[in-house]
């Protein structure tokens, strides 16, 4: 059995789980998320905990049990607390402004960059150089943050660009004459 799948997922108060065949639905205060469970994984609920067991003992089934447990744990955490990712803009004239479902970015190009936020994701700009991406789907929050960072990744000489708040940019020394 997978070491990850051995640990059950505890369901906090206010989180509801429903099974419909291989479809698993997690509903909480912040919204609802769904997951198609692999056919080799059996999910059971007992006394406020979800347990994941591989139907047969082969390596693929054990791996899928651990993966499913991690995904469901992220879903439970997302619908109860939510996820957020913070980005920083470093550079002269680099600005961000959130307008509804559009994030307007000035990143030193000859044109502004307008990024359309997907459904279920919100963006806040506490200051012109900080962006806060929030949502209940961990994968989608990370994907949106990565797409925004890809517009202008931090460069190694001056460190200018869009970076994660906890990212350490490795700097290079300028070429010597």
Swiss-Prot record:
Protein name, UniProt field: Large ribosomal subunit protein uL6
SUPFAM superfamilies: Ribosomal protein L6
Organism: Pseudomonas putida (strain W619)
GO biological process, one term: cytoplasmic translation
Chain segments annotated as coiled-coil in the UniProt record: none
Quaternary structure (record): Part of the 50S ribosomal subunit.
GO molecular function terms listed in the Swiss-Prot or TrEMBL record: rRNA binding; structural constituent of ribosome
The protein's role, per its UniProt record: This protein binds to the 23S rRNA, and is important in its secondary structure. It is located near the subunit interface in the base of the L7/L12 stalk, and near the tRNA binding site of the peptidyltransferase center.
NCBIfam families referenced in this protein's UniProt entry, alphabetically: L6_bact
InterPro entries: Ribosomal_uL6-like, Ribosomal_uL6-like_a/b-dom_sf, Ribosomal_uL6_a/b-dom, Ribosomal_uL6_bac-type, Ribosomal_uL6_CS
Protein keywords: Ribonucleoprotein, Ribosomal protein, RNA-binding, rRNA-binding
Pfam families: Ribosomal_L6 (PF00347)
Family label: Belongs to the universal ribosomal protein uL6 family.
Keyword Ribonucleoprotein belongs to the record: yes
Gene Ontology cellular-component annotations: cytosolic large ribosomal subunit
């Amino acid at each position: 059995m997978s070491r990850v799948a051995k640990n059950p997922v505890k369901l906090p108060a206010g989180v509801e789980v429903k099974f419909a065949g291989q479809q698993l639905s997690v509903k909480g205060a912040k919204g609802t998320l769904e997951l198609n469970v692999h056919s080799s994984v059996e999910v059971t609920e007992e006394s406020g905990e979800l347990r994941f067991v591989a139907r047969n003992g082969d390596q693929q089934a054990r791996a899928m049990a651990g993966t499913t447990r991690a995904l469901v744990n992220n879903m439970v955490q997302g619908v109860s607390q939510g996820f957020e990712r913070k980005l920083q803009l470093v550079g002269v004239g680099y600005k961000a402004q959130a307008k509804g479902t559009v994030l307007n970015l000035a990143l030193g190009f000859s044109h502004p960059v307008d990024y359309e936020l997907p459904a279920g994701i919100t963006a806040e700009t506490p200051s012109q150089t900080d962006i806060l991406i929030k949502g209940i789907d961990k994968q989608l929050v990370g994907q949106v943050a990565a797409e925004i960072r890809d517009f202008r990744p931090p460069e190694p000489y001056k460190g200018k660009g869009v970076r994660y708040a906890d990212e350490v940019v490795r700097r290079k020394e300028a070429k010597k004459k």
